[in-house]
Amino acid sequence: NEQANLRLSEANSGTYKTFIGRVREELGSETYRLYGIPVLKHSLSNSNRFYLLTLTSNQDESITLAIDVEDMVAVAYQPAGSHESYFFLNAPQIAFHTLFTDTHQNVLNFDNTFKSLENAAGTTRQTIVLGVDPLDFAISNLFNADPKLLPLSFLVIIQMVLEASKFRFIEQSVAYSFKNEKTFLPDLAIVSLEDNWSEISLQIQASTSLQGLFGSVVELYNSNNELIEVDSIYYPIILANVALQLYHCQVSTGDNECLVETRTTRISGRDALCVDVAGALTSDGSRLILYPCGQQVNQKWTFHSDGTVRSLGKCLATNNSKFGNLVVIYDCSKLAAEDISWDVSVGGTIMNPNYEDLALTSNKATRSTNLTMEVNTYSASQGWRVGNYVQPIIGSIVGLDDMCLEATDGNTNMWLEECVPNQREQSWALYSDGTIRVDDNRELCVTASSSTYDNWKVITILNCDGSNNQRWVFLADGSISTPGNQRLAMDVARSDVDLKKIILHRPHGDLNQQWVLFY
């Protein structure tokens, strides 16, 4: 494997992101993906078990860090030109036979877990400053093998390199620090991701057994230290954030750890309203409506492994000859399996697989609107989030050159401007229906308009109307895409921010189609 190198004397936000991309590529190649997110290899041969990367300080002091490819932890390191190497207390035995074998191998008196490193450093991650200068000092401290400073220095390096490789949110936090030459303290948003990577990976893998639902809730935080309880893959802070997963299990092998048989949650959609059994009526044929989200029992939906979705003891059902295009609840035993079977797509479309071209729809964005089955046009009126956290996710959307999407021209247009913390025009609300709304005025939606640039639709801001040119999906490849089969991606026109044009374009994965939700 070719090593990834980061030389701080030449580093900027761009070279840092290239370095992180290189690490991800090496660890995530030749493996399978779930929802587009690579799962780390496991059961590797000894010769393929470790990956080396080189970090060089501004003073030209280099260290080689050895990473366990199976679980992405630091195992050992060697200062350049030294006959000494240093292994974590919990390094696997095979590491000593494989790594730095021509050196004197020292064993450190702490292991590579955050808990052990924090204890040895006598502090916590949230008090340790991250940024270019702290990384420079950390590399230098490891190069000089100063025992008192090693735990602290590892906490800096592990977060800025390994944790950033796992999560786009952490990578972007570090990229900002390179761009602005400012340091930052890891907040709960960062620490909650770091502490939950293994659990998030397990739940993503388990979710394939039950419509994208997790077997248990993962507690994450946003940058305002507000709790976001995530219980499915249908959140951009999961799907478009996790860059690598730790291998736990494969559902196809019948592994219990990875099996979710039932899960009860809410379904939110248009204008962040919830799917509700009207009046909590339990009689067969009771209709489904949109209603303000609450904790009432008639908004609780239990997903079963047989494809049924149930509330109040009855099955979510559709049958043209019985109910017209209405969606109702009905006694599960009295209907054919094809009337009560449902699929949820990654993009948030809910369909009955036996009615291939129809999708669950809310034709109006008002409370008590009847839910119906309509021809699937991938419109925002057909976008849903299966999950208990129903509020919009608020954040900035970071694109080319670490610049932020900004609502401009009196909230009628949008393009990239330099990111400014807490600037209202750069704050967006991501709704359950797939709309991206101006946080300041949530009647306004990011829209692929009819005006064109170079034959491609220009993306502007218009009143929300539930149409298919206002629905977006944040994907694992870093794109913000339309949800239909003819997928198009949000694109900075010609990679030129000065054109002030954001357009729809065929997906190609270049930097001008890469976006990070900074929430």
UniProtKB/Swiss-Prot annotation:
The keyword Glycoprotein applies. SMART domains: RICIN. 2-beta repeats lie at residues 442-482. SUPFAM superfamilies: Ribosome inactivating proteins (RIP), Ricin B-like lectins. The keyword Repeat applies. Gene3D superfamilies: 2.80.10.50, 6.10.250.2640, Ricin (A subunit), domain 1, Ricin (A Subunit), domain 2. 1-beta repeats lie at residues 312-352. 1-alpha repeats lie at residues 271-311. 2-alpha repeats lie at residues 401-438. One of its GO terms (molecular function) is carbohydrate binding. 2-gamma repeats lie at residues 486-513. One of its GO terms (biological process) is negative regulation of translation. 1-gamma repeats lie at residues 356-388. A carbohydrate binds at residues 276-279, 296-298, 454, 491-494, 505-508, 512. CDD domains: beta-trefoil_Ricin_SGSL_rpt1, beta-trefoil_Ricin_SGSL_rpt2. Disulfide bonds join 249-258, 274-293, 315-332, 404-419, 445-464. Residues 261-387, 390-518 form the Ricin B-type lectin domain. Seed lectin similar to type 2 ribosome-inactivating proteins. The Aalpha and Abeta chains constitute the rRNA glycosidase domain and the B chain the carbohydrate-binding lectin domain. Is predicted to have no glycosidase activity and, hence, to be non-toxic, due to small changes in both the nucleotide binding and carbohydrate binding capabilities. Binds galactose and derivatives with a preference for the beta-anomeric forms. Binds prophyrins. Has hemagglutinating activity towards rabbit and human erythrocytes. This is Seed lectin. It comes from Trichosanthes anguina (Snake gourd).
